[in-house]
Amino acid sequence: DDCLGMFSSCDPDNDKCCEGRKCNRKDKWCKYVL
């Protein structure tokens, strides 16, 4: 199952971003979680 890399478009309600990243609800792309 492929995950979405940094700055990939994503769906906040179905977050498929890679580990350590989270789908940003406002910008709709994967951002690092610090």
Swiss-Prot record:
GO terms for cellular component: extracellular region. Keywords: Amidation, Disulfide bond, Ion channel impairing toxin, Knottin, Neurotoxin, Secreted, Toxin, Voltage-gated sodium channel impairing toxin. The keyword Cell membrane does not apply. InterPro entries: Huwentoxin-1. It comes from the Eukaryota. GO terms for molecular function: ion channel inhibitor activity; sodium channel regulator activity; toxin activity. The modification Leucine amide is found at residue 34. It is found in: Secreted. Pfam families: Toxin_12 (PF07740). Expressed by the venom gland. The keyword Mitochondrion does not apply. Disulfide bonds join 3-18, 10-23, 17-30. Negative results: has no effect on voltage-gated potassium channel human Kv11.1/KCNH2/ERG at 17 uM. Spider venom neurotoxin that blocks voltage-gated sodium channels Nav1.3/SCN3A and Nav1.8/SCN10A in human (IC(50)=2 uM and IC(50)=4 uM, respectively) and rat (IC(50)=2 uM and IC(50)=2.5 uM, respectively). Belongs to the neurotoxin 10 (Hwtx-1) family. 34 (Jztx-26) subfamily. The presence of a 'disulfide through disulfide knot' structurally defines this protein as a knottin. This is Beta-theraphotoxin-Pmu1a. It comes from Pterinochilus murinus.
